[in-house]
């Protein structure tokens, strides 16, 4: 696995809401969720019920696309990512379940007040755009080089 560049990781870590779309041949839906970023494994951890429309679609097709963007109004401060990922529903029997949930709770302590299903979004490709130093500067990261 390729390491995500630090400037992209920092951007992902500094934000907390992911927007994504799930699809099958018969249905598609979008969702916005709080996330915790697991830099070492290049994945997002999120809590969402497996009974939601987007989760039901992800159970049939784990491939998703999404965005994370800062909510700013100054065009020179625009930063964001577009990504493709593979979703995975964790069960309590999965070895990563408890560590993923702990990681999420560290980022979002209020989530302890309710129970929900734990999902991993394994980032496969990221396109990062920033206007910070150069207008519309783009950087691409891929989990695996071809």
UniProtKB/Swiss-Prot annotation:
Superkingdom of the source species: Bacteria
Transmembrane segments: none
UniProt-listed SUPFAM superfamilies: FMN-binding split barrel
HAMAP family from the UniProt entry: UPF0306
Family membership: Belongs to the UPF0306 family.
Protein name: UPF0306 protein HD_1359
Species annotation: Haemophilus ducreyi (strain 35000HP / ATCC 700724)
């Amino acid at each position: 696995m390729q390491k995500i560049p630090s400037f992209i990781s920092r951007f992902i870590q500094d934000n907390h809401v992911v927007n994504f779309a799930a699809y099958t041949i018969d249905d598609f839906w979008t969702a916005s969720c709080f996330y915790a970023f697991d830099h070492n494994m290049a994945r997002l951890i999120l809590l969402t019920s497996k009974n939601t429309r987007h989760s039901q679609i992800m159970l049939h097709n784990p491939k998703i696309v999404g965005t994370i963007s800062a909510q700013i109004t100054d065009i020179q401060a625009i930063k964001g990512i577009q990504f493709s990922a593979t979703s995975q529903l964790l069960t309590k029997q999965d070895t990563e379940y408890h560590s993923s949930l702990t990681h999420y709770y560290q980022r979002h302590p209020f989530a302890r007040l309710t129970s929900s299903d734990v999902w991993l979004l394994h980032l496969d490709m990221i396109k990062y755009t920033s206007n910070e130093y150069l207008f519309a500067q783009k950087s691409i990261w891929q989990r695996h080089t071809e």
